[in-house]
Amino acid sequence: MRYTHIRLLPFLAAALLVPNLGKAEIAVKNGEKIAFLGDSITAGGWGSPSGYVRLVIAGLEANGIKAEPVPAGISGHKSDQMLARLDKDVLSKKPQWMTLSCGVNDVWHGPRGVPLDDAMAKTGTYDDKVSTRGTYKKNITAIIDQAQAAGVKPVMLTATVIQENLDSKENGLIAPYNAFLRELAKDKKIPLADLNAMFQERIKAENKPNVKVLTSDGVHMNVEGNKLMAIGVLQALGLNTAELDKAKASWPPLEAAGIMAAQKAAEAKAKAAAEKKAKEAAGKGK
């Protein structure tokens, strides 16, 4: 298997590592299982009708490949928790493939996060339980090693963004985590979907500082963010431009359903808030 780098941002030296077998072809075969290991971004990627997991599966099907998803995203999870449940949630399901989306919470959770390495763990930034969480480098390497030992082919996803202000402190902190993922993917010779580079490129191109371009809250995906994630994963799985166009042509019904679901959720949230406020007001009047 040889790998081709698709350059996204020359000034970032960012790339997608795409599997290629001499003749370009989609790596996933009909009937294969794909596990999607991750946090709330991945949980939403399956839970939402327009989530990236569903778009990936629909995109493959549009190209004649019926793949079976194994959803394995849990809200709030970090690298140590994903490692702890790897066998139960992924390996026991015997998938042929596994995408790994991990890193946002390791950084975003601050003192409760997971340090990149042993040196970072000793900076005094973390709480007194940090030693029980290990380090990001060790946890991610163990996940990849265990998956490969079980015959599962991993696809690495760089962590997206923490706030769409690319100069935020959190985005600065997550950069070395993503640099490690790129290097590990290269060393292990596994496909890399450099989603962080794709997100940075898109946010800069849009140039709308006060508008959420790809996320609903700076972290979790909106419809456009899910689409961009799906494109990155499908590219890493070997889809060419024509195949990606086929995939994207299958998405509008899912996008519409996702928008409707988001609207209903927002309405329900607003209604619940109004009812709570009214109840509190009634209580004060007694």
Residue ranges and their predicted role:
Residues 71-78:
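Short beta->alpha junction loops
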Residues 36-37, 71, 156, 215:
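A structural signal for the hydrophobic beta-strands that form the central parallel beta-sheet
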Residues 28-30, 50, 54-66, 80-285:
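Alpha-helical cap/lid subdomain in secreted, periplasmic
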Residues 1-10:
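Bacterial N-terminal signal peptides that target proteins for export
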Residues 22-24:
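Boundary at the C-terminal end of the N-terminal hydrophobic targeting segment
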Residues 32-47, 78, 107:
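Catalytic nucleophile-elbow at a beta strand-turn-alpha helix junction centered on a G-D-S/GDSL motif
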